[in-house]
Amino acid sequence: MGSHVIDLVMLRNNFSTAEMRAIWNDEARITKQLAVEAALAQAEGELGLIPKEAAKKIAKVAKETTFDIAAIAEQVAVLKHSLMPTINALQAAAGDEGEFVHYGATTQDIVDTGTVLQLKDAYNIVLRDTQVVFEKLAKLAKHYQNVPMVGRTHGMQALPITFGYKLAIWVDEFGRHLERLHEIKERVFTGNINGAVGSYASFGPKGSEVERQTLAILDLNAPTIGWQSSRDRFSEYASVIGLISATLGKIGNEFYNLMRTEINEIEEPFSKGKIGSSTMPHKRNPAAFEGLASLTPPVLKSVALIHESMHVEHERDAMSWRQEWVALPEMNAYVSAQLAILANVLDGLQVKEAVMARNLEKQHGLLLSEKVMFEVGQKLGKQTAHHLVYECAMTSFEEERPFIDTLFEQAAIADTYARAEVEQWLDPTQYTGLCADKVDEVLAAWQTKGFLKEG
């Protein structure tokens, strides 16, 4: 039983996924650190820094032994050191060859590189699920490419768009997130094995080769120079996670608003027995949308904490280091939940096309004031037409009268245009501009880049 919301049995799946939690638990942390110790011993054995038999024994024990996490945790409390109890346990398990455990390395070498291994596993989940959401959005954008709806600016009705167009904007945004995830991989997944101050002194003249071989075994990149005091790699990863989360939160908030009773254009998936309120039986609340939107703020707080961790004193310290232990698991947990929520929502999203159509007529033609202005402006001039249409629109708005009636009270319109012609101007389905075309352009662009399959 835990005390953090990520670990609370009744709530944790709202804030994370089981798959992501498993990457950041005690067992995973120690397992990755032991993997680094095993790789270090193997590399040092191959390079002659330690006996080959000792290297084989250490690597075998590190990979195959089940260590007592509770006992290690007890020793952490006694020794006031997060890694030494693990080193001691590995040494004891390796017997006489254990004297060569952790040879030349410093704690931060092992912990940082272990964290990168954990982060790589987390990244793979984020990349996979971002791709899943991207593809689901693309499919829906194409499906609803020509479905007209109200476009809103400043929270108010503005001009007609299509639902597919709205979704295509998010498709394009997720495509850029995928590009960013692929772009940062080489920089972020870089280990660090270079000793107490990064000088390789404890490894002797083969220090750089020890690092390269150790990290090659772990399938990580080797740095040009140690990064114990340079935490920008984690900050870059965090920045991309923050961008992905911000898009996810924006979508959650947008869907939340579109599900409002007064708008009612979409609804999140509903299952029989789902309760919206303990006191109002009729409520069908946007719980998934709220959850999706609510997780962005804590992600961004974790991102900020990672950025603060770049402030490192001298060659390294533990103040900024510990902030990463808090922020990296949290941001990955929260964004994994967001991606899972949205993927599930998109699978069962109810799109109410009839309601979208009714909302297009809600202001009795005012939604097409721009169209009227440009049509009339061809004869009167755009600015003169703007003034004329503005006066008609305000009258229609304030008196709650059909826009076409107030327009035909103006001689400049009544004497020039047939009512049937103006009625055509006021058809919202005929004034969505290039919305449908843009859906195809977005999908084609990402197909060309190889992020999206054709069809």
From Swiss-Prot:
Positions that bind fumarate: 106-107, 233, 278, 283-285
Active site: 154 (proton donor/acceptor), 277 (proton donor/acceptor)
Keyword hit for Transmembrane helix: no
EC number: 4.3.2.-
GO biological process entries: 'de novo' AMP biosynthetic process; cysteine biosynthetic process
Superkingdom as given in the UniProt entry: Bacteria
Biological pathway: Amino-acid biosynthesis; L-cysteine biosynthesis
Protein keywords: Amino-acid biosynthesis, Cysteine biosynthesis, Lyase
Catalytic activity: N-acetyl-S-(2-succino)-L-cysteine = N-acetyl-L-cysteine + fumarate
Enzyme class: lyase
GO cellular component, one term: cytosol
GO molecular function: (S)-2-(5-amino-1-(5-phospho-D-ribosyl)imidazole-4-carboxamido) succinate lyase (fumarate-forming) activity; N6-(1,2-dicarboxyethyl)AMP AMP-lyase (fumarate-forming) activity
InterPro entries registered for this protein in UniProt: AdenyloSucc_lyase_C, Fumarate_lyase_CS, Fumarate_lyase_fam, Fumarate_lyase_N, L-Aspartase-like, Pur_lyase
Sequence similarity: Belongs to the lyase 1 family.
Additional information: Is able to functionally complement a B.subtilis yxeK mutant in the ability to use 2SC as a sulfur source for growth.
Known role: Catalyzes the cleavage of N-acetyl-S-(2-succino)cysteine into fumarate and N-acetylcysteine. Is involved in a S-(2-succino)cysteine (2SC) degradation pathway that allows the bacterium to recover cysteine from 2SC and to detoxify 2SC that may be a toxic metabolite. Can also perform the reverse reaction in vitro, and has minor activity against 2SC and other small molecule thiols.
Protein's recorded name: N-acetyl-S-(2-succino)cysteine lyase
High-level lineage: Bacteria, Bacillati, Bacillota, Bacilli, Lactobacillales
